[in-house]
């Protein structure tokens, strides 16, 4: 049991996400939690920009659990988006779409935003984290190799930084590495601690 787990042992943690990356990441700071998920309409107002979108969607997911959440249950929801030149790059529709996205990101800097919401005892606390990622110039062969041998289809921006593309394609990064994977652990740890300290 680690330090955070000692503090939250009376709390029922629920990670509301299908993402295997988020499951893997959360286990690094909390071992005992339940995975839940539901389908919701993830459309958002077109007036929202960049970080506001990730924040809105994370909060929207948290609100969807408000009626069923019981006392001392902590729901964690998150949404990750990739933004390049004010354009949101979501999950690719097909391999051609993935190829086009990676060509856009090649040789350029983009921003990854992850919004996180914590629903605890009817109160929702939300935050957003940002990481800037710069890619090397990628050849068409490199992009095709990645798409053929890895799993870009379930990832915003068509790449996973923890996969081959992250090892050979990323030139530099400013911010939380885990944020790019889908869960900003450093900030999440501290935000959970804040909630627990209020409870106590």
Regions found by a protein language model. Give the residues of each.
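A local structural micro-motif
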Residues: 33-34, 200
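N-terminal beta1-alpha1 ligand-phosphate binding loop
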Residues: 2-30
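Anionic-ligand binding patches
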Residues: 2-3, 9-14, 49-200
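Short loop/helix-cap segments at secondary-structure boundaries that form the rim of catalytic
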Residues: 24-28, 45, 67-68
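A short beta-strand-loop structural module common to alpha/beta enzyme folds
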Residues: 34-44
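Cofactor-binding loop segments of dinucleotide-utilizing enzymes, especially the Rossmann-like FAD-
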Residues: 18, 38, 121
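N-terminal short leaders/motifs
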Residues: 22, 28-33, 72, 78
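Short, glycine/serine-rich, charged loops/turns that create anion-binding
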Residues: 20, 40, 185
